[in-house]
Amino acid sequence: MRPRRAVAAAVLAAALGLTGCAPAESGSTPRNTLVMGIDVSGSFRRHYDDAIEFTALYLYGHLNGLGGLRVPTAVFVGSVGGEQAGEVKSFHPIHDFQGKSVEQIAASLREWFPMQDQVTDFSTFFDRAATLIKRQNLVLAPLNVVLVSDGLPDVPAAPGDSLGPYAQVQVGPLEYLSRSTTVRLLYPTPTVAVRWERGVERNRVRLWTVDAQVMAGWREQMVPGVPLNAQERLWKWIADNVDFRVRARVL
């Protein structure tokens, strides 16, 4: 009996070992991180209200996987900048948005990130985001950084050097955090978008810009009287225009 018990114990241990090493079920959500930065500077005042409403929809759509949007396993939302350059601001985690309606998310965003004449500091934002990702052990998970901003750095430009301020935007802390890192800039002018694409130095980080004129089109995709989970045009518009998969470094 003892040998049989020993064999049975060995088989059970092996089974437990195989169970512990088995991959996650196919229905589980793959790890991926969404970081959003909201511009509260005076230069963004014109687009602030529209941007807050879109950000609330964007978060709601992703958190609920509407229209096939990727569901993030980690979310951090903060402001881009502060009262002075280099000021570190708090990020709100995914728990602050889960279970809320679009209206509730928008109200929270307005409360946490009121429109103020603050300094826009992209480099500090990227650095803080990278620190959070490392602390939360999210390295290697696909990283999506969405900047809801006009993209104007608060750095004076030398005469004739239009790209100078953009060359000072440091995305270095985001490099090598993941095999797939994309920075998406929403609401810039076409000129600012080109300056980001040409002036911001990067290696593995991919950059995607959506002009303010294009962003204005999201409202046209909504069908009155149709619930959000059936707003297929809206979610497809977001997938095609905002979440566009950048396969290579642009410019």
Description of each model-found segment:
Residues G17-G20:
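C-terminal motif of bacterial Sec signal peptides marking the signal peptidase cleavage site
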Residues F76-R110, R198-E201:
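Short beta-strand-loop
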Residues V119-G172:
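Exposed acidic/Ser/Thr-rich ligand/metal-binding surfaces
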Residues L152-N203:
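VWA/integrin I-like adhesion module and closely mimicked acidic/polar interface patches used
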Residues T191-L251:
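P/S/T/G-enriched low-complexity
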